Every structure is written in C-alpha cells, then in structure tokens.
Amino acid sequence: IGGAKTSFSGTGRIPSQEDPGSATGANLLRVYHDGRVQPDARTAARLDSTGNPIIDPQSNTPAFDPIAPDGRTNSWNYTSLDQLSLPGFVRFNSYSAEVIDTTVRDRKPAASGGLDMAVSRDMGKLLGSRVAWQLTAGMSLNDLSSTRSDPVRARLTTVSDFYSLFGRTPPDGPYSSPSTATENVVDAVGNAVLGADGVAQTISVDTSVLLGNEPAGRVTTSATDDSSVSNRWKLKGAYYTFRAGPTLQLSLTNRFKATLGIGAAVVYSGSSYTVTQTLTPPAGVEITDTSSSEAYKLLPGYFADASLQFDLTERTGFYAGAVFQSAGSYTQAVDTDNAHYATKIDLANMSGFRAGLSYRF
C-alpha cells in the first residue's frame, strides 16, 4: 500500500557543548570547541637556605612547588592555524545555533510491503446463482517510514576569547603544551657527546610556548545563514488496520470470480519521531543535538477493495486486486529544551495492491 504522507516543521537550538566560563579570572580551566586553556602547571624545585634541593621523605625525590603566578600558563592546546589570524594572539571559540527556519517540508514515501489476513462468511445468493454476498473481517500490518535531511536557516553565535602569546609563535595546529623536544648533547665546541656505546647522547628540552592565563578580550558575534546547520527528520513505526464489511462476489466462470467489498476500518498506529540537528562550525568537529518522542493513535476510517480470484481447487485459489483505505491523520511532536518540532502523519486516501492465497473451509 502507498506510504503515509508526512510533513516536518518546527524550530530548535543547538547549545554549545563547552563552557568557556567568565571572561575574567586567572588560572581557570576554560574549555572551547577548538581547544582549552588550563591552570599553569609549571613548578620549581624547593630549596633549603643554602640553595640545595629539599628531598621529600615519603618519595625520596626532590620536592617541587608551583611557581609564583606570572600571568602565563604552559598548559593549553589549540586545533587550527586559523586561530592565529590576529597576530600575537590565539583565538578560542565556542559555537551555538538557533534554528529559525519555519518552512514546512513534505515527504511522500514510496509504497511499502505489508501483511494482510481476512476471513469471510457466506451469507447467501443475490440475483440468482452468480452473485453471492459475504461478511468479511480482516487485519493488515504496514510499515511507517519517512526520512528527510535538509540544510535549515539558523542564527549562529560565536563566542571568541583571545589569549596573548607574549611575542612567541606556536607550532602549527594541532598543538598541545607543555611540549618537549629531544636534542643532542654537545661539548663546548659544538660536537656531539658520545656514550660508551658510541651512540650520541640526547637530552629532553622543554619547548612549551607560554600563553596568557586569562583572556585578553572576548568578542561575541552572530550571523544568519542557510548552510551551517542541517536537520534530519526520521519517522519510524507501523500501523494495524482492522476492517469489516460486506463483500459481493460475482462468478465469471467456474474458476474466475470478481469481488467488491466496502466497510468500516480502525487504524492503530505507533511511531517514533527523531530529529537530529547538526551544526558544522568553521573549525572543529560537528555539534549535534538529537531529540525523539513516541506516539500511539487510534483512528477511525473506511475501506474499499476489488479483486479477481482464480480457484485452483474447490478449497484453494489465488487472488489479486486493489485496495483503498482512509483513516485521517495525526500530529506527533518532539518538545524538549532544544527541539520544538512536529510531524503530521497522514493516513488518508491510501491505495495499493494486494495479492495472496485463499483457502475455503
């Protein structure tokens, strides 16, 4: 039978997945979509009054203390070279979006297969011996399936914090600090120092680039476009049709029969509706928000069918024909903090083809 007609509409929002916190305050953890800035992790050896390292009695290793705050941190990372667009600073961003697209999008799925069973009781003859009438009751099961993906109009908000590099230039992103590099040990004239095995000796050197430990400034911008955000609407479920009514059967030959039936129907529908909103920011991975709901509806309706039947024996045969049914429509909503969407499922004026095996008791 033909698939249910559906339409999708609504608005929503995609919140930022990170919290950069306040624009002021030193040595705080701030997380962004394209990096993070953490409290300074630099330490210095604890010395006694004579300048010698103090040994921790529990670990039997030199004791270290955090250095005195100097407005910088060695613990941070960034993702893309684009974040260095302002000379002398690193820009960190967090993104959010508000979907403001009010377009109603229609979807007419293709026909889907299903299962149908019916029983009939002979009630007698009409117009002589060629026309008989029966009472028929049946049940069918069909899928509900509709999916659509589209870019939507949205208002994109970007919160950007700028951190000073103090005249340094970091390696190309992605880069994470603290960082180290391995260098050869050299003597006073620049020659490599070799070990007893003849292998050049190496040493680990701190190459960390220090960054300001709080933003030098914060800028919030908004822009509206039709390409940064896309929505995917998905409806999945099934519906049962219970029907009953009279059927007329005309004997064309000893083996061929034509039937025509009409009557009342009741449709029980169950569906799951999911909306996935996806924001593609200028840098970093996509940000998604998914919301869903379930609905169950009972709808009154009616049906009509016509078919041809060929009897193989007195008890068995094959039939094929057309079916029409109509049971109205219902609306299913997804209503959460971030999504306010609705879909209309229209089960009216549906037609299709039916074929199968008949058996006479």
Where is each model-derived feature located?
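Extracellular/periplasm-exposed beta-strand and loop segments of Gram-negative cell-envelope proteins
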Residues: 8-12, 83-110, 144-239, 268-299, ...
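Residues on the lipid-exposed face of transmembrane beta-strands in outer-membrane beta-barrel proteins
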Residues: 115-121, 137-139, 242-250, 262-266, ...
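Alpha-helical scaffolds that organize eukaryotic protein assemblies
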Residues: 233, 238-265, 269-270, 304-305, ...
